[in-house]
Amino acid sequence: MKSLDIPKQFINVDGKPIIIRTLENFASHPDVDDIVISCLADKIEYMWQLIGQYKVSKVTSIVPGGENGHGSIHNGLVEVQKFSDPGDIVLICDGVRPLISQSLISDCIETATKYETAVPVTPSIDSVLQSEDGETCCKSLPRKQMYITQAPQGYTMRKIMHAHNEAERLGITNPISSSELLIELGETVHIFKGERDNIKVTTPEDLRFLRSRYYYKSFKNFAKEELKYGL
């Protein structure tokens, strides 16, 4: 999804680009020490300008993205590896999740610290059908066993770098997510409760939902001021 030919992470919502709102959630968390951004190569200078403009703290570096999501994550991890230890926790997140809560970040860190892997999920509320041709369905999957993955996903540097090294060795070039990569490599991935509001802004409907959330928040704040001053 693009708006006026702008990459979706740079779309302005209630006065700030989506990616800035996403970054602020991590920058304000007391257990997050450093932030590394993997960004479109031709947007790196612009990204630094935004970070300065909105005074986002803890951003230590911005690296060029890869040919796909997996490549972008890999480039970011290589940068993080320069100043981290194998047991350190790294949180991997899309730049278009501006509604991440502080408690979700805390739960991710806690789960990854305990199990080395942490993936937030929400139970599927709809029935899930499997189709091989996109026209007919051959299997109904048990809804009670179906979960929708979210981000941030947390891993020890040891665990996620090993997965990326194995992917390179085996020629795995474009897994959908880090959790999918680990599962494909035979690893067990630990899940924890995610949040339904933690949307990945992908469609025009997502953008409308996001804007309505900030509009409602602004309206509530205005109403409080009216009551405070008796307007």
Pin down the residues of each PLM region.
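Short aromatic/basic micro-patch
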Residues: 12, 99, 140, 154, ...
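Hydrophobic C-terminal alpha-helix "anchor/cap" residues
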Residues: 23-27, 51, 80
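Residues at the starts of beta-strands that form the adenosine-phosphate
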Residues: 33-35, 116-117, 188
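Conserved donor nucleotide-binding strand/loop of the catalytic core
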Residues: 55-70
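Short helix-capping segments at alpha-helix termini
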Residues: 29-31, 52-59, 83-84
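Conserved alpha/beta core of the MobA/IspD/sugar-nucleotide pyrophosphorylase nucleotidyltransferase superfamily
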Residues: 146-231
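Conserved beta-loop-beta/alpha segment of the NTase-like Rossmann-fold superfamily
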Residues: 67-134, 150
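N-terminal glycine-rich phosphate-binding loop and ensuing alpha1 helix
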Residues: 1-45
